[in-house]
């Protein structure tokens, strides 16, 4: 897995939109002394506008192509913590890039816990705009099997950001010590 030693491979966080990938990713990056990159923010920088405007003006296809290009570029770098947008991992090419070059953590939040966050998510998530609760649940269910392509799954239900970040950092350190001992 990957062209870099395990200790240097980038860490990629995947999961449904709004599960905390960005917040947890920033915390993990601090704990591991790595740079944090949010793919959606990188796309927004390139287009110089928010994601919802990119979707509206250029369409989802243009957004997804930019997403693939940026992920491909960033996953070839070492020592990063990367947060993918909720829909990024739906692209087979992105799955292959990430699985072959990085360590992937799937942040799994149950539907019931995710529903509690809907109010906070609606404005900033173009994919949710105009959807009923039933349609959102279907989207959640449809994407869940895709996220099963990972190296490690983390159940985030009822866990604080710090707890999840500690778990990820400690499990990585353990894996590094087992598979690449320093002495």
Swiss-Prot record:
Family label: Belongs to the shikimate kinase family.
Organism per entry: Oceanobacillus iheyensis (strain DSM 14371 / CIP 107618 / JCM 11309 / KCTC 3954 / HTE831)
Coiled coil: none
A UniProt-annotated Pfam family: SKI
PANTHER family: SHIKIMATE KINASE (PTHR21087), SHIKIMATE KINASE 1, CHLOROPLASTIC (PTHR21087:SF16)
PROSITE patterns per record: SHIKIMATE_KINASE
Name the UniProt record assigns to this protein: Shikimate kinase
Enzyme class: transferase
Pathway entry: Metabolic intermediate biosynthesis; chorismate biosynthesis; chorismate from D-erythrose 4-phosphate and phosphoenolpyruvate: step 5/7
Cofactor note: Binds 1 Mg(2+) ion per subunit.
Lineage: Bacteria, Bacillati, Bacillota, Bacilli, Bacillales
SUPFAM superfamilies reported in the protein's UniProt record: P-loop containing nucleoside triphosphate hydrolases
Cellular component, GO annotation: cytosol
EC assignment: 2.7.1.71
């Amino acid at each position: 897995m990957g062209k870099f030693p395990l200790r240097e491979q980038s860490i990629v966080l995947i999961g449904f939109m709004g599960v905390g990938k960005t917040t947890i990713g920033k915390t993990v990056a601090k704990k591991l002394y790595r740079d944090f990159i949010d793919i959606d923010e990188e796309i927004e920088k390139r287009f110089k506008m928010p994601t919802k405007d990119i979707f509206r003006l250029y369409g989802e296809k243009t957004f997804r192509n930019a997403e693939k290009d940026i992920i491909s570029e960033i996953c070839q770098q070492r020592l990063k913590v990367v947060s993918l947008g909720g829909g990024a991992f739906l692209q087979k090419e992105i799955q292959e890039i990430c699985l072959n070059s990085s360590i992937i953590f799937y942040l799994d939040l149950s539907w019931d816990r995710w529903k509690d966050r809907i109010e906070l998510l609606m404005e900033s998530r173009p994919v949710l705009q105009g959807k009923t609760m039933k349609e959102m649940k279907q989207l959640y269910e449809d994407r869940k099997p895709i996220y099963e392509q990972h190296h490690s799954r983390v159940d985030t239900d009822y866990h604080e950001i710090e707890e999840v970040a500690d778990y990820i950092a400690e499990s990585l350190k353990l894996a590094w010590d087992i598979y690449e001992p320093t002495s």
